[in-house]
Amino acid sequence: MASIQNLYETVVGVLGDQASKVISALGEITVECLPEHYISVMTALRDHEELHFELLVDLCGVDYSTYKNEVWQGKRFAVVSQLLSVKNNQRIRVRVWVSDDDFPVVESVVDIYNSADWYEREAFDMYGIMFNNHPDLRRILTDYGFVGHPFRKDFPISGYVEMRYDEEQKRVIYQPVTIEPREITPRIVREENYGGQ
């Protein structure tokens, strides 16, 4: 655990006021920062000679609106990045809270980490988080005409539309979802001597 403590102290020393919070828990370091410091934090983590987090392993959006089965009191959306230092064999997590819940926007880190390209597109597609200065921010997993963002917690489980092939038109069409919710009542069977004898 000494290396985690050393990493924690180094990160706190390097980032200073740019990090709003540095958390060391369960053998992992998490850096939380505001959107205005996101680019400088990511650049410092990559370029500082003692840190050298040269690889972005993952980036995802998170909707905290009902975190831990309660109504969340803070910002609704965050972008979470997982960084790896191959040189030092260490990992770190960076969480940036998005300022506006209605129109979530954060700066793109594609210029710092090339691997962020498709991850940011996925976060945009699934959560509706916009990434400023992204070179090609468009949907990556859903159709271009898709309405909404399916990983948001307020998105209906069955969606809004379904697609099917129309024989008359000889093409795929969209139509409102025809799934009807049903109530399932469990059937209880009680028999004498059930379970053997």
Curated annotation (Swiss-Prot):
Answer yes or no on keyword Cell membrane: yes
Q: Indicate the principal place this protein occupies in or around the cell.
A: membrane
PROSITE patterns, sorted? COMPLEX1_30K
**Reaction equations catalysed:** a quinone + NADH + 5 H(+)(in) = a quinol + NAD(+) + 4 H(+)(out)
Q: For this UniProt entry, which segments traverse the membrane?
A: none
Keyword check for Transport: yes
Provide the membrane topology annotation: Peripheral membrane protein
Q: What do we know about how this protein assembles, alone or with others?
A: NDH-1 is composed of 14 different subunits. Subunits NuoB, C, D, E, F, and G constitute the peripheral sector of the complex.
The role this protein plays is: NDH-1 shuttles electrons from NADH, via FMN and iron-sulfur (Fe-S) centers, to quinones in the respiratory chain. The immediate electron acceptor for the enzyme in this species is believed to be ubiquinone. Couples the redox reaction to proton translocation (for every two electrons transferred, four hydrogen ions are translocated across the cytoplasmic membrane), and thus conserves the redox energy in a proton gradient.
Identification of the protein by name: NADH-quinone oxidoreductase subunit C
Originating species: Neisseria meningitidis serogroup A / serotype 4A (strain DSM 15465 / Z2491)
